[in-house]
Amino acid sequence: MKEGRLAILYFAYRPEKEAIRKPLLPEFGHDVNVHIYKMLQSRVSDIMQPTGLPVFHVDDTMQKGNGFGERLCNAAESIFKKGFDRLIILGNDAYGLKPKHLNKAIEQVRAGNSCLLPSELGGALMIGMEKSQYNRAHWLELPWCTEKLFNELFDCLSSCKLIDKALPELNSNVDIHELLIMKGELTELAAYLLAVLETSFNENHAYPPFHEDPLAENLRFRGPPFMA
């Protein structure tokens, strides 16, 4: 039996748009938040590129439809129409994403299974599936962008497997401490965040919130935390 063609759909807004929708450090202005999202997107790209799979980045200028669900369905179907019959979907939200997560998703989809990487907020950070497991009518009814999504999407997909335990989800209330603690994996981003916060301290002569935490104060001297 011939193996189906597999592609990655990177469904993510441009950094300039994302910085307006979900600023992670709103008090530091638009440009800082744009740069944060550029680094996050660069990191996701570095994870996708070694797979050798075709990657289709559908940003906000290319998305068509009313509402998140319809836009995502249209994007997925546009890739199926190119002749691909297996698809992995991810976006910017999984800042804890590692190569092992994507590799496991590839393995599951190639084995004929659908798969999900859950978020701690009840969402889905990565979706893997065959074209035959996709149902537009069902997907349009799913509670996208809510804490109910994962459970309903899991029930919607046949032969669905979990890629890993739930990971933190990037949102406007993200704890910057978490990004700093992950500095072993987000070295450039962590260094930039530290520089921004330290500049604020120097200009305002007041400690940024993270300095109140002794753990955060010592982050630059620590190695990366162990994560299974």
What kind of feature is each model-predicted range?
Residues 112-133, 198-203:
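A short, conserved beta-to-alpha structural element at the edge of catalytic cores
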Residues 132-155:
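Short, glycine-/small-residue-rich phosphate/pyrophosphate-handling segment
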Residues 1-23:
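N-terminal nucleotide-binding beta1-loop-alpha1 segment
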Residues 155-228:
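Conserved alpha/beta core of the MobA/IspD/sugar-nucleotide pyrophosphorylase nucleotidyltransferase superfamily
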Residues 21, 25, 54-82:
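Active-site-proximal specificity loops/subdomain of glycosyltransferases
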Residues 84-92:
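Short beta-strand-to-loop acidic/aromatic patch adjacent to the donor-nucleotide binding site
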Residues 96-122:
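Conserved donor-nucleotide/metal-binding helix-loop-beta segment in metal-dependent transferases, i.e.
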Residues 36-53:
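A short, N-terminal amphipathic alpha-helix
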